[in-house]
Amino acid sequence: MATSTAAVLSPPAVAGLRLAPSPRAAASFRGVSPPARRSVAARAALEPSVVISLSTGLSLVMGRFVFFNFQRENVAKQVPEQNGKTHFEAGDERAKEFAGILKSNDPVGFNLVDVLAWGSIGHIVAYYILATTSNGYDPPFFG
């Protein structure tokens, strides 16, 4: 009886950098086997690269073919004017827009700024889709 009490109350022994197994743990858990491990892998509902690519591509197509004229008309309305003329037409030579970054070979003028803007909108939509599906939200779109 004295040996089992001494084993329970003694400080843990150190063997190298690991703690040596205590006699108490070896005696009490001999009959219990560890539970069988199951191979469970977390799987995403949607492939992120596919969602981001499709969302960005769809956003660029919508920006180029659907919303382009609407966007250009609204930008033209917001140009600063004085007496019905733009500042450049009124004689301010510094009011001319820098055309280097806005120049493109696209027939309607879809330029680098448009690509970056509509591409970022596509990425935002893709992030929203991936975040909501990973939280378990599954909207019944088609049924």
Swiss-Prot record:
A biological-process GO annotation: photosynthesis
Classification via InterPro entries: PSI_PsaG, PSI_PsaG/PsaK, PSI_PsaG/PsaK_dom, PSI_PsaG/PsaK_pln
UniProt keyword list: Chloroplast, Membrane, Photosynthesis, Photosystem I, Plastid, Thylakoid, Transit peptide, Transmembrane, Transmembrane helix
Pfam families per record: PSI_PSAK
Targeting signal (transit peptide) range: 1-44
Family per record: Belongs to the PsaG/PsaK family.
Its biological purpose: Not yet known.
Protein name: Photosystem I reaction center subunit V, chloroplastic
Source species of the chain: Hordeum vulgare
